[in-house]
Amino acid sequence: MQTLEEHCWSCSCTRGRDKKGTKVSAWLARRVGKAMSSLNSLLSLAYSTLASSEGRSLIQRSLVLFTVGVFLALVLNLLQIQRNVTLFPEEVIATIFSSAWWVPPCCGTAAAVVGLLYPCIDSRIGEPHKFKREWASVMRCIAVFVGINHASAKLDFANNVQLSLTLAALSLGLWWTFDRSRSGLGLGITIAFLATLITQFLVYNGVYQYTSPDFLYIRSWLPCIFFSGGVTVGNIGRQLAMGSSEKTHGD
């Protein structure tokens, strides 16, 4: 009798475990099915975006902005190194422009992000940029930005405070001349702040260094360069976005 009871109890436990295992398997199957469905939807959305004209335009603008950022990084960094403003370790100086290999790709990526962000913010806040929207103005803005960077390496002042104030005035003048939007001013200040923090982190960890640092391991005028660079790249991104929008409407 006792053996029969033990047999019945073991059978009921086995059925309970089987039932519980079946529930777990069914739950896992549902979760996997939902995950696969979400992945399929995401891939379909990505494919449709890339296949659309807007997706192609986004990729083209990103590539153009990346190329511009790489080119400006090479040229401007060459100006700084020629004046011994920035110093890289000898083992790092390996390219034709005597620049660390990672600087141009990082600047290109940052230019692509900033250039795409400016028109996106304009559309989000409902403040389309309408001031001097032509390529001639953009090219003049680039020339002024290069001039500001060259001045930071070329001009000699009695102290760095005078140089920093002069470059700050020139940077604000660049924004006022070629932008004048609140979003451009806000993004320029944000970019200058974040880029300065990143630069301080790199210098602090010995990736490279500045000669005669006067502001937390770096030069005090560096935020002015980042601000004017953000405004310049933002104008390029806006002009590219306007051109792609007109082309889309024309099609």
Curated annotation (Swiss-Prot):
Motif KxHxx at which residues?
245-251
Xref: InterPro entries: INSIG_fam
Q: Where is this site: Required for the recognition of 25-hydroxycholesterol?
A: 145
> Primary place of residence?
endoplasmic reticulum
| Cell location | Endoplasmic reticulum membrane
Please give the residue ranges for the topological domain Cytoplasmic. 1-58, 119-133, 179-183, 238-251
Cellular component per GO? endoplasmic reticulum; SREBP-SCAP-Insig complex
Q: What does the record say about its membrane topology?
A: Multi-pass membrane protein
Which keywords annotate this record?
Cholesterol metabolism, Endoplasmic reticulum, Lipid metabolism, Lipid-binding, Membrane, Steroid metabolism, Sterol metabolism, Transmembrane, Transmembrane helix
Between which residues do disulfide bridges form? none
Q: Which GO terms describe its molecular function?
A: oxysterol binding
Q: Which GO terms describe its biological process?
A: cellular response to insulin stimulus; cholesterol biosynthetic process; SREBP signaling pathway; SREBP-SCAP complex retention in endoplasmic reticulum
List residues in topological domain: Extracellular: 82-100, 157-159, 206-219
Parts of the chain that traverse the membrane: 59-81, 101-118, 134-156, 160-178, 184-205, 220-237
Share the domain note from the entry.
The KxHxx motif mediates association with the coatomer complex. Binds oxysterols in a pocket within their transmembrane domains and interacts with SCAP via transmembrane domains 3 and 4.
For this chain, the family text in UniProt reads: Belongs to the INSIG family.
Subunit architecture: Interacts with scap; interaction is direct and only takes place in the presence of sterols; it prevents interaction between scap and the coat protein complex II (COPII). Associates with the SCAP-SREBP complex; association is mediated via its interaction with scap and only takes place in the presence of sterols.
Function, please? Oxysterol-binding protein that mediates feedback control of cholesterol synthesis by controlling both endoplasmic reticulum to Golgi transport of scap and degradation of hmgcr. Acts as a negative regulator of cholesterol biosynthesis by mediating the retention of the SCAP-SREBP complex in the endoplasmic reticulum, thereby blocking the processing of sterol regulatory element-binding proteins (SREBPs). Binds oxysterol, including 25-hydroxycholesterol, regulating interaction with scap and retention of the SCAP-SREBP complex in the endoplasmic reticulum.
- UniProt-recorded name of the protein: Insulin-induced gene 1 protein
Protein species of origin: Xenopus laevis
Question: What does UniProt list as this organism's lineage?
Answer: Eukaryota, Metazoa, Chordata, Craniata, Vertebrata
Gene encoding the protein: insig1
